[in-house]
Regions:
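Soluble acyl-CoA-dependent acyltransferase catalytic core bearing the H(X)4D motif
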Residues: 4, 8-20, 31-369
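Low-complexity, glycine/alanine/valine/leucine- and proline-rich hydrophobic stretches
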Residues: 349-428
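Detector for long, low-complexity, acidic/polar
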Residues: 23-24, 28
């Protein structure tokens, strides 16, 4: 696939340079890895013009100004912020042509080739980067990267939906919330939970905390589809009610661990991303723009995971998720305040590219991908990460091509991936 770049421009911030506002990053922004995230949306023709998309984008950025801002003090682990207005910032917009029909590359599955469909993340100069990839048939793939410390997946989903509505000329009735007063520490602050080694590490890092180099084994991305019928069969095995996420997380933990062939007495962990908005008291509005995701970590020995029932493993996941409540969130806010004079490093930044014997599972199931409709009657035919390079990372996403159910993107070494595909749908 040859991607021909037609133009590359920067959409400036909507505020004049004389008006500058600094929005401090919260502890929830800083516990997130310091990286750009990438996602692809693919649409069958007919699709709106790039000009229409750009005009809608400029309107959306007035509502989501931090996406066009710039990080100030990004190297200061104490109190960085997003500067809106002033010099710098803006959004990178790239336009490309591809001399293929979109059908020629469908169905889209994560691959290093798809990295061409969005701006590079490792040398990003802007918090938000967007690439419009036009195919010969009129099909469109929009590749987006955003700095994770400015917004989580829930926030970016709200941005995509708003942008799409503005392109279609629709009324916007939900606006982003930037109020940080909901996240202030208690007086006096106190830590009721241990956050060292779980959320943050002190700086400088001890040598034992540094990431290990990537092994020579090639990491590949496996996409497996779990139909509504298959999910119902797993739920039928449950003596108590569990969410779709919990049962699929348990099922995948079992299958990935078995595919890796680990010793039965090895301890394995699964990092689970939890949206904290509704878990704080009072709850943070769902429109809150920024990060409000925390990780919780169920642990067990390989024997318990591989030989235990799906119900047993789902209970481990359920109990770990349940530990993320108002008390834990308030404790983390206070931890950040108590250690305000120290340099802290997110544990997520020192994990490295190989998670084995552990894994991480992120859910995109609650993202309203079906509402990302830019009009012109073009139907959504792809919603996915471009490529997952981290061994042991799993992403659950809704299937958007009419099958329903859930797609799981699983990044594993090749030899483990082959076995995983063979056992991915076994119910034992």
């Amino acid at each position: 696939m040859e991607v021909h770049v037609v133009s590359s421009t920067v959409i400036p911030q909507s505020l004049p340079p004389t008006e500058t506002t600094k929005i401090p990053l919260t502890v929830f922004d800083m516990v997130i890895p310091n990286i750009h995230m990438a996602v692809l949306y693919a649409f069958m023709p007919p699709t709106p013009t790039n000009t229409a998309l750009k005009h809608g984008l400029m309107k959306a950025l007035k509502l989501f100004p931090t996406l066009a801002g710039h990080l100030s003090g990004n190297n200061d682990r104490r109190r960085p912020s997003v500067s809106v207005g002033g010099n710098g910032g803006g959004v990178l917009m790239v336009e490309t042509n591809i001399a293929l029909e979109l059908l020629d590359i469908l169905p889209l599955e994560p691959s290093p080739k798809l990295l061409q469909l969005h701006p590079q993340t490792d040398i990003a100069q802007h918090l938000l980067q967007i690439q419009f990839n036009r195919f010969s048939c009129g099909g469109l793939v929009i590749g987006i990267t955003n700095h994770h410390r400015v917004a989580d997946g829930k926030s970016m989903s709200s941005f995509f939906v708003t942008w799409a509505k503005l392109v279609r000329g629709l009324h916007i009735d939900k606006f982003p919330v930037y109020d940080r007063t909901m996240l202030i520490p208690r007086d006096p602050p106190r830590c009721d939970h241990d956050h060292w080694g779980i959320d943050f590490q002190p700086f400088p890092l001890p040598p034992s905390s540094l990431p290990s180099p990537l092994k020579s084994n090639k990491v590949c991305n496996v996409v497996v589809h779990y139909s509504v019928d298959f999910i119902s069969k797993i739920k039928a095995q449950m003596p108590r009610k569990h969410s779709t996420f919990e049962i699929l997380a348990a099922h995948l933990w079992k299958k990935v661990t078995r595919a890796r062939g680990l010793d039965l007495d090895t301890l394995t962990e699964m990092s689970v991303a939890v949206n904290g908005r509704s878990r704080l008291r009072p709850a943070v509005p769902s429109e809150y723009f920024g990060n409000m995701v925390l990780n919780t970590i169920p642990r067990a020995h390989v024997k318990e995971v591989t030989e235990g029932s799906v119900a047993d493993v789902a209970r481990l996941v359920h109990d770990a998720v349940g530990r993320i409540g108002d008390g834990y969130i308030r404790s983390l806010i206070d931890f950040w305040e108590i250690n305000s004079g120290d340099e802290l490093v997110s544990v997520a930044d020192v994990e490295g590219p190989v998670l084995c014997p552990n894994l991480e599972i992120d859910s995109w199931l609650g993202f309203p991908s079906h509402e990302v409709d830019f009009g012109a009657e073009g139907s959504l035919c792809g919603f996915l990460p471009s490529w997952v390079p981290v061994e042991g990372l799993v992403i659950l996403k809704p299937n958007v091509v009419g099958k329903g159910g859930v797609d799981a993107v699983v990044a594993l070494f090749e030899d483990h991936a082959r076995l995983f595909k063979q056992i991915s749908h076994s119910l034992d």
